[in-house]
Amino acid sequence: MSDPVLVVNELTVYRETYAAVQNVSFTVPAGMDTAIVGPNGAGKSTLIQAILGILPRRSGEIFVLGQALSPKGRLPAEIREQIAYLPQNFLFDRRIPITVKELVGLGWDRLGIQLPWTGGRARRHAVQQALTQVDALHLRHKLVSALSGGELKRVLLAYCLVRPRRLLILDEAPAGLDVRSESEFYRLLHQLKKEQGWAILQISHDLDMVRRSCDRVLCLNRTLLCQGTPDNSLTPENLSLAYGSEFVRYHHAC
């Protein structure tokens, strides 16, 4: 078995005066989709932000592709570029007349490396290939401000694809999509995981989707309550620990 893409070891992160995440340890293997589930306020977004180096950690270790995150949350540039992040909300000024192909092209440019072919044929090919992989090539000349929610999510996946990646992190990225668009989004994720060997770490409130689509699940409520396959982890006992017994009764009644 190959080495895990992400290793989190005894991680504790504080929000002001309280431990929002306490003594959490897990790994994210290559080619697998790992979901983080738990109630509001459980520390899911805090955990993601610590992994990304946005929030400082009180204690513990984080390794990406074998490289340790520094105490200041930094990784070597060549490792940092192996991580793609899709937030729940993508905010931009809709008055900016940027097209889909221009936005995806920024994913190629954003390191600021001046290569001989930057802006040339290799860049155009990478943008076209990324849009093709997410079935969005037909949108390339469309303004980003004119995209539907489902179209925008596909374009943002293309932005992540335009350079090689090893780890994709999503903070409820499908939130706000209709059922059809959400299903298409997860179909694309499954395809990319299979074809690219991506390790995926995502926050989700949709337990049915987690059961259908994810390989592993982490049940979080400040501490890690359980981890494993969805069938082994999303039991009534574990869900009651994470969410409370009222949630479990309601969820099973639906």
Language-model region placement:
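Conserved ABC ATPase signature
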Residues: 143-147, 151
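H-loop/switch region of ABC-family ATPase nucleotide-binding domains
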Residues: 204-205
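Catalytic Walker B motif of ABC-type/P-loop ATPase nucleotide-binding domains
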Residues: 168-172
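Conserved ABC transporter NBD signature motif
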Residues: 60-72, 77-79
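Conserved ABC ATPase "signature" region
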Residues: 105, 120-139
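Helix-to-loop junction immediately C-terminal to a conserved catalytic motif
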Residues: 52
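Conserved switch/coupling elements of ABC/ABC-like ATPase nucleotide-binding domains
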Residues: 222-232
